[in-house]
Amino acid sequence: MNLPIADLHCDLLSFLAKVPKADPFDPDQIACAFPWLKAGGVRAQVMAIYTDVHPESMELASQQADIFVQLLEDHPETVCRWDGAFQQHLESTEQLGIIASIENAAGIGTATATWKEIYAQFDALLEKVGSLAYISLTHHTENRFGGGNYTEGIGLKEDGKRLLDYLAGKRIPIDLSHTSDLLAEGILTYIDRHHLPIPVLASHSNFRSIWNHKRNLTDEFAQEIIHRNGILGVNFLRAFLDNEQPERLFEHLIYGSKLNEQGIAFGADFFYTQDFPDPSRHPIYFPLA
């Protein structure tokens, strides 16, 4: 029996926002094109609003939120909102359920944005997309909120604490997939110390015990997420699985299942790779994935 698949992370929105002549229906352009998702049995997909740390990040995030809404309006035969009604009628529809997320809070607030502007940006994004699957404070690098996964010695900053305060009670999980270890520790400590009702997950991360990479979760953080009833999305990128062994994907899935079989998921992280600058990273994905 083929079970419906829900995937916790793809970068279709940033692809549509930044790549000329981007087409979500062209399987030759991106691995999360709609035909690929349908062929793979994906019935529900989280679509990240991804931005890097740039002065124009807030504008780019708003553009991607508009694209998310436009997909729903222009292609109702293909996509619908991933909500309770969709899940209830999953077996009777051919549509793909979609929900947005925010990958890097630089899209909520750039380095020079005032807090009035940050709150307004967050509220506007949430109003546009309707709901958010999760928010990550950082990506690879540092921003005003904290340290990304490739930073050293940078944890949760004061602005990060203030943003967590604003998220409290909104039922939007915080994502640890792109945090430094120090930032992950800071987020968890701050949530506990101030009794903030914020769920925690890792949308597209693997396990450092299987493959030693800074983008992967330590056992400590993986177990902490499970302890908080969060979920772990296994990432399909070769760099985070194993440089040589495609079957390592299965090891990450099995390892996560042993932590909690109800808490493991896919977080494939399919993005536009045709302009990826580092030749050592190719192939980005094993054919197995």
Locate each region found by the language model.
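N-terminal hydrophobic targeting/anchoring segments and the immediately downstream early-domain regions
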Residues: 1-156, 161-162, 169, 212-229, ...
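Short, glycine/acidic-enriched loop or turn micro-motifs at the edges of active sites
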Residues: 10-12, 178-181, 207, 272
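Loop-centered beta-sheet repeat module
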Residues: 152-189, 194, 200-205
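Aromatic-anchored, glycine/proline-accented short structural segments
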Residues: 187-221, 225-228
